[in-house]
Amino acid sequence: MARVGLPRLAPPTDAALRRALASTAGARLTYDAVGCSLGRARSDDLVEHTWTAVVSGGSDRFERAVEALRSWQVHRGAGLRVVADGPTEVGREVALGVPLLVAQVVAVCRVVAVVDHDDAWGFAYGTLPLHPERGEESFVVSRVRHDVRFTIRAVTPPSWRRPFSALGARRYLRALQRAVDR
């Protein structure tokens, strides 16, 4: 079974991320409360953090926001290297090269839920053994009247890493704004 890798100075290559995906294929999630970032489950040992931003108005921007999430453009725009084993749907896995100050880490997740409504689209993914944290994160864009909102929820154990998660959330929010402004 794959274990959490050590931070590295150089970004991982796509080949290294594909190997990380292969090494965690069929692995169990590292937490039990599947769906917790979307309010579908509870866990007493995990803490929720939420970040929301109004992106801008207009239905065309909502469609662009959905496409940016669906295609992993938001993650790439936030500075992550992304290798996924298929489209964003339940059961799909993704390996991420995540920059942290002066180092890079590999994080592997599995999509555990997809939100697909007329006025909302998004997904939640959960951590697999080759991930530096434990828990779940969701990314949902929604249309509320004339606004497009982007909400990120991270449900993880209490940790000193929270400032890094807040920084990551701000990067995702800015990346989505750039994607819809194009």
Language-model regions, residue ranges each:
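Short, solvent-exposed aromatic-acidic interface loops
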Residues: 127-131, 153-161
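Hydrophobic ligand-binding cavity/cleft-lining segments
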Residues: 1-97
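General beta-strand recognition
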Residues: 95, 122-124, 149-151
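Compact beta-sheet-dominated globular domain cores
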Residues: 144-149, 153-155
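A conserved amphipathic terminal alpha-helix motif
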Residues: 10, 20, 24, 160-182
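Hydrophobic-ligand binding "helix-grip"
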Residues: 2, 101-146
